[in-house]
Amino acid sequence: MATIGRRAYAEIFGPTVGDRVRLADTDLLIEVEADYTLRAGGYGEEVKFGGGKTIRDGMAQSQRTRAQGAVDTVLTNALILDHWGIVKADIGLKDGRIAAIGKAGNPDVQPGVDIVIGPGTEIISCEGNIVTAGGIDSHIHFICPQQIEEALASGITTMLGGGTGPATGTFATTATPGPWHIERMLQAADAFPMNLGFLGKGNASLPDALHEQIEAGVMGLKLHEDWGTTPSAISNCLDVADATDTQVAIHSDTLNESGFVENTIAAVGGRSICAFHTEGAGGGHAPDILRVVGEENFLPSSTNPTMPYTVNTLDEHVDMLMVCHHLDAGIAEDLAFAESRIRKETIAAEDVLHDLGAISMFSSDSQAMGRVGEVVLRCWQTAHKMKLQRGKLPEDSERNDNFRVKRYVAKYTINPAISHGIAHEVGSIEVGKWADLVIWKPAFFGVKPFTLIKGGTIAMAAMGDPNASIPTPQPVHYRPMFGSYGGSLARSSLTFVSQAGLAAGIKERYGLAKHLSAVKNIRNVRKKDLVHNGYTPKMEIDAQTYAVRADGHLLTCDPAVQLPLTQRYFLF
């Protein structure tokens, strides 16, 4: 039987079992765990499109119609990187969803085919490329709509948060307050090739105004200290969430005016709640908000300006905070408020807590102490930094960093999906889910995607000069594709709403074009449900020195002096 060398095979069909791939210029190596394209019984039945290749009539392309089982699109020979595995496979898409993950081809002439290619099937060649689920950014200040294009170009396909534009309240808080603003933001969502979901204002001591917002269509509620996150507001907001199966996100009381972290934990009362920027630089009980990392009902996340900890982190934060929270540097109390939130000890511990799987999610805090286009990038920078500083994780072999990579990819994909009740639609590459996929060339992994697929349609891509004779000539930059225009846009993206809002008929009442998907199964979520990131240590934070201990171990790390995924990727 004819054979081919491993290097030649990888160059033609992409890596297979046992091959390793470096992620961009990081020190992270992944190894292919399984190859689903071998379901034909071994090598030799791979599919590939092009002149002289196998996806041709009567070969790997069958005569079957769509009604007879042919899929709409196949991503061939993709290296899937997801929380559940790192595998080589063909991916079949149909009706905007992932229809199958396995072996594509023509079942009339090939064995082991579970994805049928027909005359009506489009091909996206992924040989040598990595495919991840679209990222989810769960901490968005909707300050300007241009954030959405920036986020999409970085690999984010779902944005959750609140706001009404460049209003003072939105500069500081992720809340879309009241039915009128909620209706307007849901109508605006129809214009963007992005899954969107909005949080209402949760700061109230009586329930009626919160129920009103849930019924208007918000997918959850936000408690923010700038609106007064008191124990009574916390308890009332969670009562409404329990009654409506929605999530609550909390930014607690930095100044400890209405109580300390113990009082907030008591007011939450064991109920599920998302804790944003859990380290505290972004806000929360000073200096010990990190205590909540040890609570099983708190679902902790970080925002990206403190991640990873570098020699520049502390210097930029005070000025950034003053602007975001409408503070005046000429007022001593305002300056003290800002400085109380910036602590190098807790920022250093944050990196380590991520590596331990104790902080479960990444997000941006867009334009409000965070960078909307750097969620994915900073996540992988942190993984790289922790490998250099802490070494291999015990779950990883000497050959690869597969477990660490799965832990970190889960932080911006499946875990925010689970936490916010949207995991039935997005957050992973699994059959039945919305086909939001990001294709990366390995050399650019985590920093610059190659192609972005929304609901089965290409919505954005790194595209060359439109007047060139081929697609590749410079300048290559991110350009919207057909999935970002016209009726295709509305059919390729979702808007997440409450069950109550969907039942109230807001789609028709507001005249919405996008498909509305109701959040669900939220109120029983616990930290142990968050994939690869469910560690709940006993947390201790020294009120004088700010030293952080988890299960008795001091957590600290040095600031990075240099990082991957930086200047060499941004020369132009």
UniProtKB/Swiss-Prot annotation:
InterPro entries: Amidohydro-rel, Metal-dep_hydrolase_composite, Metal_Hydrolase, Urease_alpha_N_dom, Urease_alpha_subunit, Urease_AS, Urease_asu, Urease_asu_c
Cofactors demanded by this protein: Ni cation
Residues reported to bind Ni(2+) 1: H139, H141, K222, D365
Residues at the catalytic site: H325 (proton donor)
Coiled-coil spans in chain: none
UniProt: substrate binding residues: H224
Chain positions recorded as Ni(2+) 2 binding sites: K222, H251, H277
Record-annotated Urease domain positions: 134-572
Post-translational modification: Carboxylation allows a single lysine to coordinate two nickel ions.
Residues modified as N6-carboxylysine: K222
This protein's UniProt keywords: Cytoplasm, Hydrolase, Metal-binding, Nickel
GO BP term (any one): urea catabolic process
EC number: 3.5.1.5
Annotated cofactor note: Binds 2 nickel ions per subunit.
Family, as annotated: Belongs to the metallo-dependent hydrolases superfamily. Urease alpha subunit family.
PANTHER family recorded: UREASE
Name of the featured protein: Urease subunit alpha
